[in-house]
Amino acid sequence: MKDLHKNGVLILDFGSQYTQLIARRVREQNVYSEILSPETSLDAILSKQPAAIILSGGPSSIYEKNAPNFDYNIIDSGLPILGICYGLHLLTHYSGGQVSSTGEGEYGSAEIEIHIKGTLLQGVRSSKVWMSHGDQVTKVPDGWEVLASSTNGVVATMADKKRSLLATQFHPEVHHTLDGEKILSNFLFKIANCQPNWTAGNFINEQVEKIQEFVGKGSVLTGVSGGVDSTVVAALLHKAVGKRSHAVIIDHGLMRKNEVMECVSALKDGLGVNIHAFDESTTFLSKLEGEVDPEKKRKIIGNQFIFSFDRIAKGLGDIEFLAQGTLYPDIIESGVSKSNTAHVIKSHHNVGGLPDEMNFKLIEPLKELFKDEVRKVGQELGLSDSLINRHPFPGPGLGVRIIGEITQDRISILQEADKIYMEILYEDGIYDSIWQAFSVLIPVKTVGVMGDQRTYENLLAIRAVTSTDGMTADWFEMPPKTLSKISSRIVNSVRGVNRVVYDITSKPPGTIEWE
């Protein structure tokens, strides 16, 4: 089968907050993209047989000490290159031009004036773009021509057509650049001649081949949490190795209400997946007893999952492989990324909470995908819309939604409250408009009045965000009537909660989950 990773786009990451967004925008046009460290050598790049290179933006000035740099031989490699913001500055510098800090940066929405459409700007109708720069080009290199300028006279787009080098001062990957998708499309297909073969169907075929080759005649254990990612992994493994794939759902006591029963029914009855359910709640909760630190809770849950899998696998026969639903954003947030600029935000149970010595060979078939791509794969595999469109659910389950100590009483309170929350979102027809919604039990009690009695009960936070891949998220503007219904029904139905608050924090600065 043709390698989907060849003839794609390699993105050198200079620390931009938008680097992953560039990767997503390229993939949305069915072209494979991969993020690499800026130190990647030309030989290493050529070995991947890319069709083009994109140089990302970044927070540095190119003249700063220790500013990120790259192998400038790439410029003369013959590969089409698109430099964005900091990438434009690097191309300018190494082509003999000049970049300066004038003290007059441009940040936010801006207008540009197009002088020469050329191939890159062909079909571009809107002049609205998104700028985020302090430095600017003050001397255009020989052989380059300016295609567009900002209203302040700053070079906005330029090109060296002979070498297929192109650059923008603005960010075409950001939605605020209204014709950014068209600009990227021109670069991918009219300049770099990329082939749109990064599709869900091709991805499935490639992964099935890889899994079959890797596993051979062996058997695979697939952990299912009830969320979209693990469900898609279970379906993909079932397609690859059939009954030799053992989907295991471990009830760690931290699932949503009725989660285990619903998950088993959907996979077994709907797809014929070989699935087993095990109640391990007593073991998990005893390990978590008294622990309040969120990182330690994640590690405990991750470790216990592997130990439980190991024991369960031995009971199921000779199983040497473990499949996980690790996604690309999981790896990025855990600091296991291509750029040295990454910082650990929080460990994910799939990538940071595992024991050093594992008794399994790990399979992570979705680790290159963003969440929206996972849903497309799920659709291609024949999963129902109700499964595919379920909101993301973390592997540690409610363990990261109970702030502070985890007890059975607190779990029961959160399960019941969250069930009511989801029911109302469905009733009001807004569930599918939200990327992720959930409840969080706070270790704070507040005074209230019910009837003629004073109450002193738990505070519950509810959260709902919109997003496309989980990398960034905005809080969902919940209709006031829906908020009122949620609060009223929870407070009146769930014993132990007397106050509900709504979290209106975006990501960044917050993360989607509280822990």
Explain the meaning of each model-derived region.
Residues M1-L55, P59-S77, H93-E320, P329, ...:
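RNA-binding accessory domains that recognize and position tRNA/RNA substrates
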Residues G78-L82:
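Conserved pre-ATP/AMP-binding loop-to-beta segment of ANL
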Residues G83, G87, T92:
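Gly/Ala-rich beta-loop-alpha elbow adjacent to hydrolase catalytic centers
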Residues Q324-T326:
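Extended catalytic-interface subdomain
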